């Protein structure tokens, strides 16, 4: 008999290690608590119900915050990641590779279930994940251009983490469901929208008649 589809949210909780990289230094701190202070930088974790908020505040120029969880995923799992901008037909399920960057979110397919890890849309950082045999890592790149962000004591909500486990659903259905959790306010027009990718719009001779 077909297993009933079951989607369950879960929380990663506070990370086991927090690394803060500023313009001047790189500090690795023990995690396991809601507030971690590294030099003049504070990283704060809040359970916000359906997601977990990560806040960063600092008097230093912060380049990146790295969060590490000792959350082990079996080496036999298959992984599907996203792309920074858009996919170019190169997204695929692949084996575990600890040095592969997985932008925004990823799915891990185990024998009986699929695990999903991601951040909600519109974060205040460029976010990517890594997964290896000993745990998973989330990178929060908060640079302004190529230099550390000058928060000057302001509190930045860098990202909102969401996690989901799926049983009895295929991977495509699971990805659809997880994308709904990452974007809870999509804008869907009531009519089809067609577009074209015209690299020459700025200096070419384009017209409505020519394109259509």
Tell where the protein language model's regions lie, with residue ranges:
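Carbohydrate-recognition beta-sandwich/jelly-roll modules
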Residues: 1-212
């Amino acid at each position: 008999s077909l297993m009933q589809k079951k989607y369950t949210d879960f929380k990663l909780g506070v990370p086991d290690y927090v690394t803060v990289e500023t313009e001047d230094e790189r500090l690795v701190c023990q995690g396991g608590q809601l507030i971690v202070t590294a030099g003049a930088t504070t990283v704060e974790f809040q359970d916000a119900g359906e997601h977990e908020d990560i806040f960063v505040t600092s008097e230093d120029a912060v380049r990146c915050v790295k969060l590490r969880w000792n959350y082990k995923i079996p080496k036999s799992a298959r992984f599907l990641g996203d792309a920074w901008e858009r996919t170019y037909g190169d997204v695929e399920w692949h084996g575990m590779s600890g040095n592969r960057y997985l932008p925004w979110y990823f799915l891990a397919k185990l024998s009986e279930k699929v695990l999903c890890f991601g951040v909600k849309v519109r974060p205040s950082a460029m976010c990517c994940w890594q997964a290896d045999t000993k745990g998973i890592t989330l990178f929060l790149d908060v640079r302004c251009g190529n230099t550390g962000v000058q928060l000057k004591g302001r509190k930045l909500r860098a990202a909102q983490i969401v996690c989901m486990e799926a049983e009895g659903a295929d991977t495509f259905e699971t990805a659809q469901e997880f994308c709904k959790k990452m974007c809870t306010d999509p804008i869907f027009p009531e009519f089809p929208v067609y577009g074209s990718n015209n690299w020459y719009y700025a200096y070419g001779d384009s017209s409505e008649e020519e394109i259509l």
